[in-house]
Swiss-Prot record:
SS bonds (residue pairs): none
GO BP terms in the entry: cell division; cell wall organization; peptidoglycan biosynthetic process; regulation of cell shape
Span of domain FAD-binding PCMH-type: 27-207
Cofactor(s) the protein requires to work: FAD
Family: Belongs to the MurB family.
Species of provenance: Maricaulis maris (strain MCS10) (Caulobacter maris)
Catalytic activity: UDP-N-acetyl-alpha-D-muramate + NADP(+) = UDP-N-acetyl-3-O-(1-carboxyvinyl)-alpha-D-glucosamine + NADPH + H(+)
The organism's place on the tree of life at top rank: Bacteria
UniProt name for this protein: UDP-N-acetylenolpyruvoylglucosamine reductase
Upper classification of the organism: Bacteria, Pseudomonadati, Pseudomonadota, Alphaproteobacteria, Maricaulales
GO molecular function: FAD binding; UDP-N-acetylmuramate dehydrogenase activity
Amino acid sequence: MTLLAQLPTVRGKYIEAAPLKGLTWLRVGGPADVLYLPADESDLCRFLAETPDEIPVTVLGAGSNTLVRDGGVPGVVIRLAGAFAKTEALDGYRLRAGAGALDKMVAKAAAKAGIGGLEYLVGVPGTIGGALRMNAGCYDQETSDVVVEVIALDRMGRRIIASPDELAYSYRHCEAPEDWIFTGAVFQGQADDPDAITKRMNAITARRETTQPIREKTSGSTFANPDPPGTPNQRKSWELIDSVGGRGYRVGGAHFSEQHCNFLINDGTASAADLEQVGEDVRARVRQQHDIELRWEVRRIGRVSGDQKQEGQAG
C-alpha cells in the first residue's frame, strides 16, 4: 500500500514526491514523500486524528531556518499557508496571527493598527510558527516578550490553548511537546503611532542589510549563542567561529559568510551535505579549542544520503 493510500481524505491538497528545495531559503535537499497543504485548522485536525501514528509528520514553514537533507523527508511534510497566514487586530492592542504568517508581515500588520512592540519581527526571517517553536528574536527582544496565547494541535488532532508560562520559554527554546503543531498565537503590544513604528522597523531592516548577508541563499543564524542575552561577558557564536578560522570556511559550494560568519551560505552549487559538513567542522573546532558545544539554530530535517554522517536534528 502506498503512503498516499494510508492517508485520510482531506479538503486540502496532497502532493507525492514533492520537491522541497524551492521551499527553503538554502535551496537544497531532497523531496518529501508527501507534501500536505491543509485547507484550514479543522482540515489539519482531521488529518492528524486519522493519520496512523507510525507515519512521520514534519512541519515546514517558510523554510528560512531549515536545512532539508539530500535524502528527502520521510512521511508527510505539512506546509501551513493560506488560512494559516492571516492576521487580525484585536481590542486592547492585541494582534492575532496564524502560524503561517510571515514574521515581517505580522510586524507590518501591527504597525498599520498602531500596535507597538512587535516591530522586532520585521528582523526575524520565517513564520510565526517557527518563532513560537524556537522563541525567535533579534536585537534584545524575543517572541516570549510579547506572546500571550498560543494555539496548537497535538498529534491526535486535539486543539490546545496554552499560555507562555506553560511553554516555559527560554533563550531560543520552548518546552512545548515535539508533536505540537502551532496554528496561531495572540500577541500583546501597546498603543503607538504607526509612523513611529514604521520608522523603527525601517531602522531594523537597514541594520540587518548592513551586517548580514540577507541577499544570499542563507538560513540566518546557524548556531545559537552559548549564553542568553544579558549574560555578563556573553559569549557569541560568531566570535567563537571567527576565532577558529571559520569565517569564509568552505566545503564544496557551502561556506560561512565573510560578512557575518554565523551565516551559512549556498553559492548555488552546494548540497545539503556540504552545508551540514561546514557547520559540523566548525563546531568541532570550537569544541576542541574552547570546550564549548555550539547548538544548531538551523533546523535539520530528513534522511542523510550516501556517506553523510547522521546527526541529531535540532529545532
